[in-house]
Amino acid sequence: MKIAVGVATSGRRKILACMIDRLAAQTRKPDHLFLSPATDEDIDMEHLRSVPFPVSIVSSPKGSCPQRNAIINAAAGMDALTFFDDDFFPAANYLAETEALLEADETIVVATGHVIFDGIHGPGLQAGEADRIIREDPTPDPAPAVVPAHNAYGCNMTFRLQPILAHRIFFDEELPLYAWQEDVDLCRRLSPYGKIVAFNRLRGVHLGVKAGRTSGLRFGYSQIANPLYLVKKGSVSLKWALRLMGGNIASNIIGSINPPPYVDRRGRLRGNLIALRHLLLGALDPRHITNM
């Protein structure tokens, strides 16, 4: 089986280099690494000279969806493609366990792993902290448990490429920039063609680095516009979208009272309100964030 790793990156040159070092330490190396940077400055080319697998730099317009789609097209000769965020550190056996999972069950089309610690919910982690958490993982090799999942978590997700290419199911480029919930959309559109699973032996740490993320205002708008756009296109249910939006609005209202320094809750709440106003006016569109 040929397994590629794809990373769409923007504004995280140093942490990307650290993440590539963790890929180089995998017990089962990727057969190819495809990097899609937002700009030429996002990649340390000198650092890539020493990695023990082929690397290709893939050009595309800026945005999570077009960058990832460019990687999919470039990786067409592979059997599977694992997308890692540039701030996700996989445990050393991640790709070995991925290969074993896909070979054991050919009906799996999407697999996601267990995030031991997710820095997105706090101020973020440094590389050394993430390495320590992986070393101290209390259950590094748990009894295998493969369970059905609604969708993969975008920081670590593996796709069998044949269904994507055969049915032309790509990331939706109408979701611009950070493209919040693009992982859910793609998974739900792939669900008729096989299983979507979470596997507890695919383990790693999401650092939740704050550099390179979209503004609070833009993200708040996407928290309303993107779920409703997915409802309209039929990839998710209205119930799912309302629950997601309601939770985010409530968090932003509460968080705006005494906001933490690492989350722009007030900016997100403003974005929520602008989106709700656009909804009432019939003008809601995920693409509006490009003008904010």
Where are these regions (language model features)?
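Active-site donor/metal-binding and catalytic loop motifs
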Residues: 178, 195-217, 227-230
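Active-site nucleotide-sugar/metal-binding loop of Leloir-type enzymes
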Residues: 65-80
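Acidic donor-binding segment of Leloir-type glycosyltransferases
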Residues: 20-59
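Short, well-formed alpha-helical segments that are part of the catalytic scaffolds
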Residues: 7, 11-25
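A short, conserved alpha-helix in the catalytic core of glycosyltransferases
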Residues: 152-159, 163-168, 173-202
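Conserved donor NDP-sugar-binding/catalytic core segment of glycosyltransferases
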Residues: 93-126
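Short, flexible, basic/aromatic active-site loop/helix in glycosyltransferases
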Residues: 130-150
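Non-catalytic, C-terminal membrane-associated alpha-helical segments of glycosyltransferases
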Residues: 217-226, 236-292
